[in-house]
Amino acid sequence: MEWLNVLESHGQALLGPVAWMVVWSLVKIVVIAVPIILCVAYLTYWERKMIGAMHVRLGPTRVGFKGLLQPFADVFKLLTKEVVVPSAANKVLFVVAPVVTLMPALAAWAVVPFGPEVVLANVNAGLLYIMAITSIGVYGVIVAGWASNSKYAFLGALRASAQMVSYELAIGFVLVSVLLVSGSLNMSEIVLGQGRGWFAERGLTFLSWNWLPLLPLFIIYVISAVAETNRHPFDVVEGESEIVAGHMVEYSGMAFALFFLGEYANMILLSCMAAIMFLGGWMSPIDIAPLNWIPGWIWLGIKTFCVVSMFVWFRASFPRYRYDQIMRLGWKIFIPLTGVWLVVLAIWMQTPWNIWR
């Protein structure tokens, strides 16, 4: 990272320390936010292609080679549509709600490590920051349902908020379990902790990652992440046969697109968190020279892509659950299970068989 130090010294000399700090912060935000938005655009393309393949269809093929420009066509379509604000709606809150939904999904990336030293803010409470910032998104959903002054929107917002809060508890217990075995809230240290152990010393790094000893928690985390993002088969929030588009039913144009962007950005974020906490983050699966030459951010991207593809696979494979089944799964199965596993881990770590020493 020598070139970064040179760039920083020249920037401070040219603009002054305060102005350079502001400019450099904006540059880092753009460098992270723009690729995330592009990833969201092409996640929609991959979702349609993957589901099409599972249904023995072609998916989008019209715009660009193999439909590669379809996401840009969708963005252009939404940009040209009128944003209609219902006459009975609270106009200020109606406009603010989509922004409140999207911003936490982008702000959370500030502490996500893409490599050993590639992170916007390497804070010691990174995991706590992620837990706090991602819980704010539910307020955008509640505000959207209330501000729309529509029965369908309000019912959808109630469903969404209850579902998101329920599964946030299960995810929270899983994160506490990872904190327990890692001994740190720092995201980079959580990744580095997975590179130690008997298997890692013999080059089989992928067997030292947390997914193996914490396999039940990994499964619970992935399913809870699907429910947290209101994705199929937990998408009763947008049940077309019941409440149409839920809290988004009165939105159109770019206001609707911001909700859409927030949902897919959360999918990528939670998938990246799964890669960091359970799949070794930026580390290669086997400690050999050809794989170690591949940059860490590529390994993190591959692992995130695999978890995101599981979201799409669930959508194409499973029928929608009833609302009462979703709440029962969260409160009566996942939360008690994660609580029990937390106790089991605490006891395990006090025994001679503690593998995280």
Curated annotation (Swiss-Prot):
Span of the secretion signal?
none
UniProt EC number: 7.1.1.-
Q: Does the keyword Translocase apply?
A: yes
User: Which UniProt keywords are present, listed alphabetically?
Assistant: Cell inner membrane, Cell membrane, Membrane, NAD, Quinone, Translocase, Transmembrane, Transmembrane helix, Ubiquinone
Gene Ontology molecular function: NADH dehydrogenase activity; oxidoreductase activity, acting on NAD(P)H, quinone or similar compound as acceptor; quinone binding
State the family it belongs to.
Belongs to the complex I subunit 1 family.
Reactions catalysed, semicolon-separated, are: a quinone + NADH + 5 H(+)(in) = a quinol + NAD(+) + 4 H(+)(out)
What is the name listed in the Swiss-Prot or TrEMBL entry for this protein? NADH-quinone oxidoreductase subunit H
Q: How does it assemble?
A: NDH-1 is composed of 14 different subunits. Subunits NuoA, H, J, K, L, M, N constitute the membrane sector of the complex.
Catalytic EC class: translocase
TM regions (residue ranges): 18-38, 92-112, 127-147, 165-185, 206-226, 268-288, 294-314, 329-349
- Gene Ontology process terms (BP): aerobic respiration
Q: Which organism is it from?
A: Bordetella pertussis (strain Tohama I / ATCC BAA-589 / NCTC 13251)
Among PANTHER family, the record links this protein to: NADH DEHYDROGENASE SUBUNIT 1, NADH-UBIQUINONE OXIDOREDUCTASE CHAIN 1
Q: What is its main location?
A: membrane
Q: Where in the cell is it found?
A: Cell inner membrane
